[in-house]
Amino acid sequence: MSALTPPTDMPTPTTDKITQAAMETIYLCKFRVSMDGEWLCLRELDDISLTPDPEPTHEDPNYLMANERMNLMNMAKLSIKGLIESALNLGRTLDSDYAPLQQFFVVMEHCLKHGLKAKKTFLGQNKSFWGPLELVEKLVPEAAEITASVKDLPGLKTPVGRGRAWLRLALMQKKLSEYMKALINKKELLSEFYEVNALMMEEEGAIIAGLLVGLNVIDANFCMKGEDLDSQVGVIDFSMYLKDGNSSKGSEGDGQITAILDQKNYVEELNRHLNATVNNLQTKVDLLEKSNTKLTEELAVANNRIITLQEEMERVKEESSYLLESNRKGPKQDRTAEGQALSEARKHLKEETQLRLDVEKELELQISMRQEMELAMKMLEKDVCEKQDALVSLRQQLDDLRALKHELAFKLQSSDLGVKQKSELNSRLEEKTNQMAATIKQLEQSEKDLVKQAKTLNSAANKLIPKHH
């Protein structure tokens, strides 16, 4: 791409905007990132000038954006894969000083910044990925906790720092993939913050969100207090992903460790679901106990009312018998009125008796349901205990495999040292052998010279002997 001089010396707003965009994306347009097996390849393209052309160029902006998206996706693949492998080999909880983890956050920051629209403020234009991350709490209620925690952190003063803290807390919560998927699925909300061809708006964003699921096997712990997240410079270190020709192959047992970790994560997830079920059942049991208490109180009130009605009935019977005796001599109409009052009292007593029977039946039903819930709780607690025992066993197996791995690595290192020593000894022996062979050749040559001299002396002696005779 050729660089042309602008027609005027004074920069225009359009010139500043294009120059700023070129400055931010030069690291992506300068190289093409591709995958060679599991290694990174960087292919340098033509030089790119930061001074824009006044005339339309032949470069397609959509092609450049697609190239940037592909580069970022490949970098994210390498970063996530390298982080998982190194974390499993390390075998401990990761902290903020771990280099592969730092590079992962840098790559994620570049992915979130790609195609981000600039917001106009009093100080100029500002690009921050904190705005899209704030939307997650509206889509996933569980994210409200980490958003509130980020806002409460005292040392954060810029939106960039808050976004970086949010990414770290989401990774600690093992929900980063879930949050990113929920955010990417809402393109209509993201369009307020991103350009149409940004990474978060295209298929590459969904692929990266799917790759983040693998990070749920990593345990990370970050201390946000005192860490300067506002002024950190996010530069991708390509040297971590370039192929080393002398790199050694992974030691034996990595497959078994991966299988054990998968089983461990499965058991932990199952244990979490069982705990949630136990909590739900406990809530239902509490509600049933409250309902049972209420029904017991209602039953006691009904019993008291029945006793009162029985007393009233006895009193009414006594009064009726008295009235019958007294009214035998009275008018017939009075006896009819007393009979109606007695029938109404009997009807009222029958209704109260039926109400008592219904309340007792409901109480028996609630008691049986409570017994069933208690039995289900006991079975679930037993299942949880068994799963926890299995989890402990799997962790023990994982520790044994790690110890075996370290032992094999130590033996391999010792054997490599022995082979190296033997190779050095062999080279020294070969050197001595060559020296001895050269000495033997010199001795053979000297022997030949001596034989030749002896023959010469013999012939000379033979010639001298006849002369003396």
From Swiss-Prot:
SUPFAM superfamilies: RUN domain-like. Expressed in brain (at protein level). Phosphorylated by PAK1. Isoform 1 is partially phosphorylated. The modification Phosphoserine is found at S34, S49. Residues 321-342 are annotated as: Disordered. One of its GO terms (cellular component) is cytoplasm. Residues 271-362, 422-463 form a coiled coil. Residues 95-227 form the RUN domain. Keywords: Cell junction, Cell projection, Coiled coil, Cytoplasm, Developmental protein, Differentiation, Lysosome, Membrane, Neurogenesis, Oncogene, Phosphoprotein. It is found in: Cytoplasm; Endomembrane system; Cell projection, Invadopodium; Cell projection, Growth cone. One of its GO terms (biological process) is positive regulation of intracellular protein transport. Residues 321-337 have a biased composition (Basic and acidic residues). Disulfide bonds: none annotated. The modification Phosphothreonine is found at T5, T12, T51. It comes from the Eukaryota. One of its GO terms (molecular function) is dynactin binding. Interacts with PAK1. Interacts (via C-terminus) with Ras-related Rab-5 proteins. Interacts (via C-terminus) with Ras-related Rap-2 proteins. Interacts with PIK3CA and PIK3R1. Interacts (via N-terminus) with FSCN1; this interaction induces neuron axon development. Interacts with DBN1. Interacts (via the second coiled coil) with GTP-, but not GDP-bound ARL8A and ARL8B. Interacts with dynactin/DCTN1 and the dynein intermediate chain DYNC1I1/2. Directly interacts with DYNC1LI1. The second coiled coil domain is involved in the interaction with GTP-bound ARL8B. ARL8 effector that promotes the coupling of endolysosomes to dynein-dynactin for retrograde transport along microtubules. Acts by binding both GTP-bound ARL8 and dynein-dynactin. In nonneuronal cells, promotes concentration of endolysosomes in the juxtanuclear area. In hippocampal neurons, drives retrograde transport of endolysosomes from the axon to the soma. Plays a role in the generation of neuronal polarity formation and axon growth. Implicated in the formation of a single axon by developing neurons. This is Protein RUFY3. It comes from Mus musculus (Mouse). The gene is Rufy3.
